[in-house]
From Swiss-Prot:
Signal peptide: none annotated. Its EC number is 6.3.4.5. The lineage of its organism: Bacteria, Bacillati, Actinomycetota, Actinomycetes, Mycobacteriales. L-aspartate binds at residues 119, 123-124. This is Argininosuccinate synthase. It comes from the Bacteria. Pathway: Amino-acid biosynthesis; L-arginine biosynthesis; L-arginine from L-ornithine and carbamoyl phosphate: step 2/3. The keyword Amino-acid biosynthesis applies. One of its GO terms (cellular component) is cytoplasm.
Length: 401
């Protein structure tokens, strides 16, 4: 049986050099798989050809933008998915989709191994490998950058010794990962927590201080899904792309945070996610109007746990599936419109309307037309505070308060 390695191929130096390296290591063929997740930049046909030129037996490019938006970004919107209340899981939600297509390619080409280019210090090694274990445990996993101390210098030396066609350029000091949902920047001078990020690291967002005129936008949802912007029907992908442009032009969606990595270390990360942040903020605002108080309280805890599961690489796990089912059940009435102003790096919600709204004007108003029966409040207050009152009485008598 021929050994076949299915490689998560980015088109960069490391995974290009990995093709001939892996071929030699297992004496077999390499199937390179690349996904277009809306990351922009290089033409994907060029990426495909580079893999073939490096010696791949097959090079597959998958246009997965709509699939990514509908099946990975949309659940993140419904879950208000923010790890540590800030990070909208830009890289974390893309890894299970890459895993899915690598496993499919493994079945198509009778793959025996699967490989990725992650190091041993990051979260992505976990996301990839747990995903492979969950979906096809028969594939043997190879991680050359981690397992064989693969460095950039070693990669270039191997390429020169083996005539691998690579384009050497001045190396960016940063590690960058991007897709339509956002952009992640790390390492380089950012590893010193006191160093402020310079303007040149940003690509999805303009400087919030530019003074652009405010941009007012209306985002409409049906069952928690964005369906139109300013009255124009959009797909989820189109909604993300348009808000990337509009919110990005206002400097919305920049994050600078110290993140608790799964492997136990803290890491400074810079993110740009204008469309993601705008959609999640709008969705949260609509949930405030349409979800009952106790359910909303409980969902906030579920949302946080969902983000942790996804961040930790457990997309295919049983808890994540159960959390998905709960979250989906909460979205039945999350239908309506949110109006927001994008300006100078901020989002201001200034309008909400929904045919499923739980806001009752006549109960909320303090003016004429008030239907709230305030005579019921006194008894409610007494009963609400009764258990606390009894406990404090006991503690006072015991001299503890």
């Amino acid at each position: 049986m021929t050994n076949r390695i299915v490689l998560a191929y980015s088109g960069g130096l490391d995974t290009t050099v990995a093709i001939p390296y892996l071929k030699k290591m297992i004496d077999g063929e390499v199937i390179a798989v690349s996904l277009d997740l809306g990351q922009g930049g290089e033409n994907m046909d060029n990426v495909r050809q580079r893999a073939l030129d490096a010696g791949a037996a097959e090079s597959i490019v998958v246009d997965a933008k709509d699939e990514f938006a509908e099946e990975y970004c949309l659940p993140t919107i419904k879950a208000n998915g923010m790890y540590m209340k800030q990070y909208p899981l830009v890289s974390a939600i893309s890894r299970p989709l890459i895993v899915k297509h690598l496993v499919e390619a493994g079945k198509q080409f009778n793959g025996t191994h699967v490989a990725h280019g992650c190091t041993g210090k990051g979260n992505d090694q976990v996301r990839f490998e747990v995903g492979f274990m969950d979906t096809d445990p028969n594939l043997e996993i190879i991680a050359p950058a981690r397992d064989f101390a693969w460095t950039r210098d070693k990669a270039i030396a191997f390429a020169e010794e083996n005539n691998v066609p690579i384009e050497q350029s001045v190396k960016s000091p940063f590690s960058i990962d991007q897709n339509v949902w956002g952009r992640a920047i790390e390492t380089g001078y950012l590893e010193d927590l006191w160093n402020a990020p310079t303007k040149d690291i940003y690509a999805y967002t303009e400087d919030p201080a530019l003074g652009n005129a405010p941009d007012e936008v209306i985002i409409s949802f049906e069952g928690g899904k964005p369906v139109s912007i300013d009255g124009r029907p959009v797909s989820v992908l189109q909604a993300i792309e348009e808000l990337n442009r509009r919110a990005g032009a206002q400097g919305v969606g920049r994050l600078d945070m110290v993140e608790d990595r799964l492997v136990g270390i803290k890491s400074r990360e810079i993110y740009e996610a204008p469309g993601a942040i705008a959609l999640i903020k709008a969705h949260e605002a609509l949930e405030d109007v349409t979800i009952e108080r106790e359910l909303a309280r409980y969902k906030r805890g579920v949302d946080a746990r969902w983000a942790e599961e996804v961040y930790d690489g457990l997309w295919f796990g049983p808890l994540k599936r159960s959390l998905d089912a709960f979250i989906d059940s909460t979205q039945e009435h999350v239908t309506g419109d949110i109006r927001m102003v994008l300006h100078a790096g901020s989002i201001t919600i200034n309008g909400r309307r929904s045919s499923h709204s739980l806001y009752d004007f006549n109960l909320a108003t303090y003016d004429t037309g008030d239907t709230f029966d305030q005579t019921l409040a006194k008894g409610f207050v007494q009963l609400h505070g009764l258990s606390s009152k009894i406990a404090n009485k006991r503690d006072r008598e015991a001299g503890n308060n």
